[in-house]
Amino acid sequence: MLCISVGPRADQPPDTKDTLSNIAEMGEFVINIVSLPLSNAMYESSGTHPPKADEFEKAGLTPAPCEVVAAPRVEEAAVSMECLLDRVLQLGTDHLVIGRIVRFHVRDELYENGRIDVAKLQPLGRLAGNYTKVETIFELPAEDF
């Protein structure tokens, strides 16, 4: 299972975003993990675009076919997850989208011993409107609770 939050932009009216409309209409979606080399393309695709705009083209990215879902994945993404929609929960003005991952796409050079090498992936994230990249990987000892 996987979940994402889709909410209105602070600078826009609280209408349904194209992302949420597309997921609800299609019943499926793709999550592409953004790594540092794709940061500018991610930022470009996060802007406000007309509903039928080609965001792949605007961001300089290549759509690639998926194996299970109809939606395209980002060819340049090091990790992509094809998902089937389980449900959407409205929480205030935000929506929690819950999906079941049905297919992973992972670049060979990132996959070691049955796991994704997060240090090589260099994933990006959002924290309170700012961006962050994973730089330090560490383990904590397992505890019995």
Language-model segments: residues:
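Basic, polyanion-binding surface patches
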Residues: 1-145
